Every structure is written in structure tokens, then in C-alpha cells.
């Protein structure tokens, strides 16, 4: 696992280099609660926000025990909501993917950073046309905004008045260069709908939008607008959705964010005032010295569990 572990440590290091534009939080003085499983701490919560990769699944495999634990949570009347930094496709595609793996959620029980982007841009419309990069789903749902898919015609870059990067499935150094040159010559708003650096799959990591955008910023491009964990827009949406799903107001102290990543799930939850639950055995921190990582980053979860 040496190469694997080194990759994971590099991800943490790259995330640390982006800390200055991530949300901040005052660390609480309460001790972190340790438990073997998420199942052991369910009674502390009335609602759970669930990251997808590293908590529900890694690539095409469900994480062992997740179905059982979520069934127990539902029996305890705990409201569940998947909150994922995935933007290249629509939320219902995530539901279909999880369903095909044997994990059932309703459409309302999934919020993606794509949805956060669509809602944010509907209320805070940038000047159009908006150049869309990395979309593999339906057209972006933003009323009265002219959205152009730049993959169809990259001669259109100069005619755009704003940009959004959804995903990096088809991204490469050529696209990176085109975007860099275009923004350097003529700075315009750039929205990034996935603040993840990487996503864990069974045997490897995929490189996600924040990785490429951090390199743009390091080379002098202005800061983008981030939409997704750890930034507050997606958590505000999630709170509204939790209260709709549960039919009541649930205090933040009774809502847990379960994630595998310190810089998105845990930092986001801590800065928003939710309880943070780090799951360590299946995602980004698998086979790493978790205590050392927490000390190094000073991002301290309220709870640490190994598995569901």
C-alpha cells in the first residue's frame, strides 16, 4: 500500500494548500467520540447527511454494512440525506446508481453540488452566456440563462461571459490550457460545482475539479466561486431539505455529517455548526495514520468511526 498511502498523503497536502480559501471554524474543546461503527452512535442524531464515495460506496461496490445501518437508522426515525460533491450528472442518476448497488433513496433524499449550483445560479445569475464544462447529464436547469456546452465547440470560449466547471471526466491538459489562457486574457467569473480534489474508486483515485482549479489559481487566475462541500450553499440547501423531509425543525446539534474526507465533509460540517462524523476505513483515509492527519490539519471531527 506504499504507493497508495503516498497518494492519499499527497491529496491531504494538496487540500492543505487550498485551506486559505476554504471556510474557517473555531475548533471546539469537546473531545472526539470514538466508536467502531456508525451504528453505535445513531442515538445521538435525528438526521444524518451522508457523503457518497467512501461512506455509501467506493466505485461500483457498496461499503459492507451500510444497508443494515441505514435500515436501523430509518427504524429509529432518523432522517437521511445524501449530500454529494458530484456535478457532472443529475442527482437522479446518483439515486439510480445507488439503487443498482442495492441502496434505496427517494429523489428528495439526494442533494448534489450540481443542484446547489443550479439553485445558486438561478438566484444569483451571472452574465450570460455561461460556458458549461464537464456536463454528461441533462442540460443545466437555470431559467433564463443561456448555457453553452463548450465541449461541443471550444472556439466559443472567448464569447462566454462566465464559466462553470461541473466535472473532469473528459478534462485534460489541452482543456486546462484553453481555460487558463482564456481567463488570463479576459478574467470572467468561474463557478466550480465540485470542490473535491479526488474521489476514491476500488483501486484508484479519479482527479476531480478542485485539483485542476487549484493549479489555475496557483498560476495567477482569480479565485472561483465554489459550490459544494465544504462551502455553505450546499449545507443551507441540505438544512431546508432535512426540515422538509422530517416535517419538523431539527437543531444543528442533532444533525451529523458522515464523510471520509477532512477538508470537505468534516471541515464543512464543523464550519456550518453540524456534528461531524469521520469514517476512516473505506475512503480517502484508508490505510493512513488518521490521528496524524487530524493533528496535521487541525480539522477535528466530533466523532470517528471505522465503518457503517
Regions found by a protein language model. Give the residues of each.
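Single conserved hydrophobic/aromatic residue that forms the stacking wall/gate
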Residues: 1-12
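Positively charged, low-complexity intrinsically disordered leader regions
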Residues: 13-49, 57
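Asp-based phosphoryl-transfer active-site loop
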Residues: 40-63, 82-83, 269, 274
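Active-site phosphate-binding/coordination module
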Residues: 68, 76-153
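HAD-like small-molecule phosphatases
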Residues: 118-205
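Acidic, Mg2+-coordinating phosphoryl-transfer loop and its flanking beta/alpha structural elements
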Residues: 147, 258-292
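Conserved Lys-Pro-Asp/Glu-containing loop-to-beta segment of HAD-superfamily phosphomonoesterases
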Residues: 226-265
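C-terminal cap/substrate-recognition subdomain and adjoining C-terminal extension
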Residues: 293-308
